[in-house]
């Protein structure tokens, strides 16, 4: 069972916490992570692209010239695909790119990435963010004290407006709650900062 130090927002070690092996200590499964990431990105696509076929563009109702005798190639409509302003042949139409992946796969992908953060020393556990007001500076100071630099994902156990709004104007810092944690953000952000309550909730949800 992996153990990790717990710090306060001043950057001082206050305790340590044991992490459940089945969530924070498994062998990362890259194939499953990739599969779930592709699914996540596909589900973000709007799929609103659209083109008009020759039946939908305006004009072209009559034959532009007679079939024979002009010396020109035969044409049936000035809105056929080969014409300028003609309809598009086999063009994209609105569609949904959404599909589902197995719930076990999604859970395994999250656990793989949490374990990866532990293995690569990219996980920081804080006792709590007890902010009594919304101030960007206090979050900047907390991250500086914790020696967390670069892209950082802060995952909270529950909604905390003071913490979330204190972090939202800091470049390369994002906050999520346990119920919205996802593969994309765990991969995008190098550092993962969580509270002791978050550890408990993750172990409760993913056990």
What are the roles of these predicted feature ranges?
Residues 1-46, 91-207:
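Extended polybasic, low-complexity segments that bind anionic RNA or targeting/receptor surfaces
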Residues 30-68:
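A short, flexible low-complexity segment enriched in Lys/Arg and Gly/Pro that occurs
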Residues 54-90:
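Glycine/serine-rich anion-binding loops at beta->alpha junctions
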